[in-house]
């Protein structure tokens, strides 16, 4: 399952379109039926090409691969417990889009839509936290009790909780560094699943 998932996600970026996936995936499904190993031996990826393709890919929120990648990333943290399937998750911009529009503080405005700036966040929290600076978002990520004594539960996404505990702000450099860690980790994942040449 990990090998097929890694292959499909990578192939969807390097060779977009459902039709492009049919040939390699069908051959491996035949191998499964015939009780042979799934190897994708004719379709191994080059790590540098993957990195370049990911760097040039637009991970916009309308693409299912965006949410899939950030969900995968959340579970690369060994401390991340399983999140409830009943919870609705949205894509959180850690460095708020609205903040960039108001402050014009990113040297490259495209970084606001970088995979390194996105995380899963429960919809009930994202509605309240979406337009704030990171220092203000921390309260919503961690949870709090409001002036009426109502407890507002925080996120179950461990990475966001770790960020609130260790970072005073989330800057453009943090976006770039986090993106690099994500891609390095994904390429390592492909390597572990024998999908790299």
Predicted regions and their residues:
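Short cysteine-rich loop/turn motifs with clustered Cys
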Residues: 64-90
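Histidine-centered nuclease catalytic patch
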Residues: 82-114
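Active-site-proximal structural scaffolding
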Residues: 1, 22, 43, 62-63, ...
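Generic, well-ordered alpha-helical scaffold segments in large soluble proteins
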Residues: 3, 7-11, 28, 32, ...
């Amino acid at each position: 399952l990990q090998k097929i998932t890694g292959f499909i996600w990578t192939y969807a970026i390097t060779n977009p379109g459902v039709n492009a996936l049919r040939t390699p995936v069908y051959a491996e499904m035949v191998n499964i039926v015939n009780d042979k190993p799934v190897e994708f031996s004719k379709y191994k990826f080059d790590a540098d090409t993957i990195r370049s393709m990911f760097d040039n890919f637009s991970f916009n929120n309308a693409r299912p691969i965006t949410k899939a990648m950030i969900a995968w990333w959340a579970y690369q943290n060994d401390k991340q417990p399983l999140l409830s399937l009943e919870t609705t998750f949205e894509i959180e911009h850690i460095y708020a889009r609205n903040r960039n529009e108001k402050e014009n503080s990113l040297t490259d405005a495209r970084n606001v839509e970088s995979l390194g700036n996105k995380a899963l966040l429960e919809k009930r929290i994202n509605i309240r936290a979406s337009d704030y600076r990171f220092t203000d978002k921390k309260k919503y990520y961690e949870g709090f009790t409001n002036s009426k004594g109502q407890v507002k539960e925080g996120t179950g996404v461990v990475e966001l909780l770790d960020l609130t505990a260790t970072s005073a702000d989330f800057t453009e450099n943090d976006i770039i560094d986090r993106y690099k860690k994500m891609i390095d980790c994904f390429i390592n994942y492909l390597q572990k699943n024998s999908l790299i040449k």
